């Protein structure tokens, strides 16, 4: 039994004639029941052979094979494409957990020439293929292949290939890529919003079922060339506009001190409950220092705020507005209006208490528990986020402090003893006779021995 992504209980013969590739029933018309020749199916155009790995050109603009999902495009240079263990497999209806295994394939897109004559290389785009399908259908899970990143669900058996049929673009659209809650998308990448292909028979069936009058009008429209949009046209136009303005498409916008200050002030002007902390306005500036009443946030998360790559995991636990009001205990408390010199105003606090319950079946449970344990009561740990480094002193203040330290370190001479003070005065006749007697006897009185050399 082969599975078809996007369809419930899909078998090897993936669908009957009245089911679209995305699993939605469509209206059966007369045109769907009649036999169609090659020309009718393609509305007068020549049959386009399905491109495979051997028939597609090497220009870099053709997507290898046909992935069931839209791609993930890189928009920042130097970023690495990777998922955490157990993450990275796109969600699709009808695919059991045992079949959720495969790899992401890097598609190197073509380069183009800017108006000033320079060659610009578009950043790569990644596509997902189930194990045993796609450009590396013969590879085993975990093989070291350039441009391949292996992913699998924790319940999948990676020793066997997936029982997934290949996608036929004429009958199945590419499914917009979605991941399980808690999945962390690689930094510098974004998910394409929808597939690039559409069934060729949809517009034909619609036009043939309108009646003879509209059929003539539609046949005249067939002579007009169909307008096609290349997958990379949007990127090319954006790059050309940026090149005309003298900017590099791959260069991130620089944040100056002035712009960061403006962003920070804009956030702080909002009510406290509407602030969103980020790099320019950290958590402690928005909500104050950590303590018993605000006990969440490690050092890294306090710096980055909601820009922290782990924050989307925590956002899965955040209650909705409805859950906040209807699932919490609320209490309205009136607070003091301030000092006597301030204008009188009524201040209230809407105090709330509640709980968010989850268990080990929640997708990404282990990662969520790890992030919670790292950030809950982190201020109590040694060297926690609440330890603030001292502000650097200004140059003038530092020099004054150094000069004061030098003055403090200078040793001041002690006052002379009474004997030392007496030696400096003139000797009286009595002193001279006493000194002569001492010299004759050869005895030096106590206290005068050390002072005789002064």
Swiss-Prot record:
Which residue intervals make up region (Disordered)?
Answer: 1-62, 160-179, 186-230, 271-292, 382-428
What sections of the protein cross the membrane? none
Note down the stretches annotated as region Dimerization.
267-383
Q: What is the effect of changing residue 321 to A?
A: No effect on FGL2 transcription
Q: Which residues carry this modification: Phosphothreonine?
A: 177, 428
GO molecular function, a single term: RNA binding
Question: Spans of biased composition, class Polar residues?
Answer: 50-61, 215-227
A Pfam match is CoV_nucleocap
Q: How does it assemble?
A: Homooligomer. Both monomeric and oligomeric forms interact with RNA. Interacts with protein M. Interacts with NSP3; this interaction serves to tether the genome to the newly translated replicase-transcriptase complex at a very early stage of infection.
Into which family does the record put it?
Belongs to the betacoronavirus nucleocapsid protein family.
Protein name in the entry: Nucleoprotein
Q: Give the gene name.
A: N
């Amino acid at each position: 039994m082969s599975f078809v992504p996007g369809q419930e209980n899909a078998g090897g013969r993936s669908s009957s004639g009245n089911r679209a590739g995305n699993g939605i029933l469509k209206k059966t018309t007369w045109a769907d029941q009649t036999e169609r020749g090659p020309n009718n199916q393609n509305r007068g155009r020549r049959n386009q052979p399905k491109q495979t790995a051997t028939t597609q050109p090497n220009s870099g603009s053709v997507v290898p094979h046909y992935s069931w999902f839209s791609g993930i495009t890189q928009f920042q240079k130097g970023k690495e494409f990777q998922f955490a263990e157990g993450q990275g497999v796109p969600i699709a209806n009808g695919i059991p957990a045992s079949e959720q295994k495969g790899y992401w394939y890097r598609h190197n897109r073509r380069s183009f020439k800017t108006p000033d004559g320079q060659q610009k290389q578009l950043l790569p785009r990644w596509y997902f293929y189930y194990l045993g399908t796609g450009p590396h259908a013969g590879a085993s899970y975990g093989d070291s292949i350039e441009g391949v990143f292996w992913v699998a669900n924790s319940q999948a058996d990676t020793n066997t290939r997936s029982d997934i049929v290949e996608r036929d673009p004429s009958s199945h659209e590419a499914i917009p890529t979605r991941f399980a809650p808690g999945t962390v998308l690689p930094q510098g990448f974004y998910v394409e919003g929808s597939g690039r292909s559409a069934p060729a028979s949809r517009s034909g069936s619609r036009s043939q079922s309108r009646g003879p009058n509209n059929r003539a009008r539609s046949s005249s429209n067939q002579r007009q060339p169909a307008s096609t949009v290349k997958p990379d046209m949007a990127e090319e136009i954006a790059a050309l506009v940026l090149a005309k303005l003298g900017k590099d498409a791959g260069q991130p916008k620089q944040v100056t001190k002035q712009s960061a200050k403006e962003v920070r002030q804009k956030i702080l002007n909002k009510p406290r409950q509407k602030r969103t902390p980020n790099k320019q306005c950290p958590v402690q500036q928005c909500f104050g220092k950590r303590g018993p009443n605000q006990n969440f946030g490690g050092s890294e998360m306090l710096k980055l705020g909601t820009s922290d790559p782990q924050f989307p995991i925590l956002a899965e636990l955040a209650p909705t507005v409805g859950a906040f009001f209807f699932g919490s205990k609320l209490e309205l408390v009136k607070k003091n209006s301030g000092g006597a010199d301030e204008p009188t105003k009524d201040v209230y606090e809407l105090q709330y208490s509640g709980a968010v319950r989850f268990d080990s079946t929640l997708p990404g449970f282990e990662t969520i528990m790890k992030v919670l344990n790292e950030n809950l009561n982190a201020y109590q740990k040694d060297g926690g986020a609440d330890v603030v480094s001292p502000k650097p002193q200004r140059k003038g203040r530092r020099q004054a402090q150094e000069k004061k330290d030098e003055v403090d370190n200078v040793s001041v001479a002690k006052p002379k003893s009474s004997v030392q003070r007496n030696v400096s005065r003139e000797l009286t006749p009595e002193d001279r006779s006493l000194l002569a007697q001492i010299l004759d006897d050869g005895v030096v009185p106590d206290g005068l021995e050390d002072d005789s050399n002064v």
